[in-house]
Amino acid sequence: MTIISDSQIVVALISALVTGILALRLGRELYR
């Protein structure tokens, strides 16, 4: 089991937020 550092958690959260926002934008564009 590997120890996850705070920086890795922050990077994962930011990447998840970015991908979520991009997915929402893509969904809205396709919905139109």
From Swiss-Prot:
Transit peptide keyword on record: no
Report what the protein is called: Photosystem I reaction center subunit XII
**Source organism of the structure:** Zygnema circumcarinatum (Green alga)
Enumerate the transmembrane spans: 10-27
Name the HAMAP family on file: PSI_PsaM (MF_00828)
GO terms for CC? chloroplast thylakoid membrane; photosystem I
Any Pfam family hit: PsaM
Q: What are the record keywords, sorted?
A: Chloroplast, Membrane, Photosynthesis, Photosystem I, Plastid, Thylakoid, Transmembrane, Transmembrane helix
